Design a protein with these regions (language model features):
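Conserved GNAT acetyl-CoA-binding A-motif
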Residues: 117-127
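Glycine-rich acetyl-CoA-binding "A-motif" of GNAT/NAT acetyltransferases
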Residues: 70-74, 134, 160
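Conserved active-site alpha-helix within GNAT-family acetyltransferase domains
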Residues: 105, 130-148
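Acetyl-CoA-dependent GNAT
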Residues: 2-3, 10-16, 21-99, 108, ...
Length: 173
């Protein structure tokens, strides 16, 4: 596997949590990532509760994108609605020390390919808060397009953020 390649694998709590829990170091960044679904800083029990909740309610599975040594460089959760054939990506994050190298795009391309080829999704959706411009640009670079917006969906301190709904259709990557 070339140096800059990634592989998707299931998130393994005992191996991966300590690594990814260090990626978000600021409260505002944390709010952009999870919209208040977990405490800051990320605590193991709270993170497990969040993963269990989205697994039970939405069928989400957590994944990591790992480098050639098996070390996580990215994380996301994915579910598919088999009735509508729509996949959903959530809680996407990339190791901040690895940003700017195209790994976020590579991880998203792998995630979307997985969704289309292995879960039968016809489209994959995600939401991103409007202030998270870096993430939104990354999603757009993969082929995601904004199709809706919930104005004033989230408040952080004195700020009000919109929630942007984005989608990519099969064949759009």
């Amino acid at each position: 596997m070339p140096k800059n390649e990634l592989r998707l694998r299931p998130f393994i709590l005992c191996r991966d949590f300590e690594i990814i829990s260090k990626w978000i170091t600021q409260p505002r960044e944390h709010a952009m990532w999870c919209a208040g679904r977990t405490k800051f800083p990320i605590e193991r029990e709270d993170f497990v509760r969040m993963l269990e909740d989205i697994a039970e309610n939405c069928g989400d599975t957590p994944f990591v994108a790992a480098d050639i040594n098996g070390v996580p460089v990215g994380f996301f959760c994915y579910s598919v609605n088999t009735g509508s054939n729509e996949g959903m990506l959530k809680f996407v994050m990339v190791d901040p020390s690895m940003r700017g190298r195209g790994l976020g795009r590579k991880m998203l391309r792998l995630a979307v390919r997985y969704a289309f080829e292995f879960t039968g999704a016809e489209r994959v959706n995600l939401c991103v808060l409007s202030v998270n411009t870096g993430a939104k640009r990354c999603y757009e670079s993969v082929g995601f397009k904004e199709y809706g917006r919930d104005e004033g969906a989230f408040r952080y301190d004195n700020e009000v953020w919109d929630r942007c709904h984005m989608t990519i259709e099969k064949g759009g990557i």
